[in-house]
Amino acid sequence: MLEQFAELNLLRTDRTSICACRIMGVMNFIQTLAIAMGASWVSGISLYASVATLGLLSRFANLQLPGELHVLTSWWVIGVAVALYVVEFVADKIPVVDSAWDVVHTFIRIPAGAVLAATAFGDFDKSVQVIAFLLGGGLALSSHGTKAATRAIVNTSPEPVSNIVVSLSEDVLAVVSILLAAFLPLLLFLVVAAGLIVSALVLPRIFRFFRQVCRSVRGFLNPAPS
């Protein structure tokens, strides 16, 4: 009788342990997904803020970065990201300069967002990393296109105040989104979903922006004869 009771308790303990492991696995996956989504989506807005914030959170808030993102904790990486963010912070507040900055960063933010997402899933199967790479690039593309299209609209205003306000709002959104990804992942999912809806609404302007980028690249590679 005692042996049966002991076996029953052992079985219950095993089931509890299995359930606990599954719950922990789900929570870890959600955390990884949130950081991957947050890092890639924010990269389309401010890549350097995304990298610097994640690195600083890991250093000072004991945030465990998933996969191979621990490379962001390097003081060299953090220092370079902060320095570039300072440059971007200034450039982003100047009309016309901000649009030129966005054109150049079309070739930086989107690939970087894809790499950050794939790196976050570094402990997963290679196929999962490829999927994360593709989806991360798509998220960075959507947020970058929305940012650039919004700036093109704002720059039509003759006064600089609106441009500065929009830029500061983007800075706050970038940092807050990374904080949500780290500590409140479900809210981050809602923010990204809202961002995708906004991207869909301004899709025609996003297409116009990327056509402009293509024309600029063609003009640079094939300058008109003088």
PLM regions and their residue ranges:
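A cytosolic-side transmembrane-helix exit/cap motif
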Residues: 69-76, 121-130, 148-159, 207-221
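Mid-bilayer segments of alpha-helical transmembrane spans in multi-pass integral membrane proteins
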Residues: 111-120, 129-150, 172
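Cytoplasmic-side transmembrane-helix entry/capping segments in multi-pass membrane proteins
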Residues: 99-111
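Cysteine-centered motifs
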Residues: 19-21
